[in-house]
Every structure is written in structure tokens, then in C-alpha cells.
Amino acid sequence: MYALKNYLLSMQSHWMINQPLYEAVQQSMPMIARYTGREGLERLETTPAAKMAKELFPGIYRVPLFRRQFCKLMIEEIGHMVEEIPFQPNDSEDTLRQIPEIVLREHSPELYRNMWFVVNTVINPIIISLFQRECRDIASVQIANYNLAEKKQGAWHHDESADISVVVPLNTGGYKGGGTEFHRHGVLK
């Protein structure tokens, strides 16, 4: 089991969340509570959290989730992590779709619990705001290493274990290539 080196990453709180987004989620909670209390029989009004999401392609949104400082700390922590835990491809996926990853539930339960906290308290309200569906049962939280030196490209796929996927680039602008391409829509870098 990997022990986190940076104490801040072990704190279950919202310090790492982009503050305007966090405030928008908090302001959205009464609206979401009314909507869910009425069992979704009435329309959910546009929440402040939904207003923070920018629709880039139909049904595909960008949200300013984490603070830059958190992303920097995570990248540093991943540097320590790979000294003890190598990135491994998922053997249950076919070769074209295998990206080296570290599954947090298996290797860093403490960090997994903190990401679970973020899913429940921040991401889930955003998903309810955008899609009027809850997404509390997360299938996996992993750190993927999209490295052009080791893998020139991935292949089209659907995440079999999820109806909704959340991709969080930690080092935006700190690499060449990369990004996430959405079939018949375009590439997000």
C-alpha cells in the first residue's frame, strides 16, 4: 500500500477544489434537494453549478474542477508514487485500448477515499445539474499515464463500467500531443 508523502493530499476537505466552482455547487444544493425531493417530477432549474460548465460538444462539458496548486501537488505525488508502484496496463482491456494506469482503490486507498469524497460532494451535484441523474457509484478512480514515447495512440472505446466518465488532466499544457478525442466531435487538450 502506498503511503502519501504530502499530508495535504490526505485531508478530506474541499481545499483542492476551484473556489468559484465550490461556491456554485454549494449554491446549487438547495435547488438539487428540491428537485430530488420531488422525485424528478418537475424540471430542475439551471443551477449555478451548471452555469460553471462550458459545453464544448453536445453532452461534453469542461468544468474548472481542481485548483492549480492541487494539480501541481498531485503531479509531484505521482512522481513519488511511481517509484513504488509502476503504471500497469489493464489486462482486461484489449491491447489497443490499454493505457498504463495506477488504480487508486488498490494502491492508495487514502487518496481514493479523498477522490470519492470529491465525487460525492462536488462532481455528483454537477452531474445532477447537467444530466438530472445521480452518479454516486463510481466504478474506478485511476491515474493514467498517456505517454507518447510508450504508446503512440489509444483507440476508440466506451468505458464499459460507466455511463458517465470524468477525465481530469492534471498537467494541462505540460506535454505534447495528448488530449481526449470524442468520436465525431473533436479533441479536447
Model-derived features: positions:
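Fe(II)/2-oxoglutarate
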Residues: 1-58
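Alpha-helical interaction segments
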Residues: 5, 102, 106, 136, ...
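Short, functionally important structural connectors and interaction interfaces within domains
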Residues: 17, 24, 57-58, 62, ...
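Short low-complexity stretches enriched in small and charged residues
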Residues: 19-21, 29, 93-98, 119-126, ...
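FAD-dinucleotide binding site
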Residues: 19-20, 47-48, 55, 64-65, ...
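Non-heme Fe(II)/2-oxoglutarate
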Residues: 37-133
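Catalytic core of non-heme Fe(II) oxygenases with the double-stranded beta-helix
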Residues: 124-189
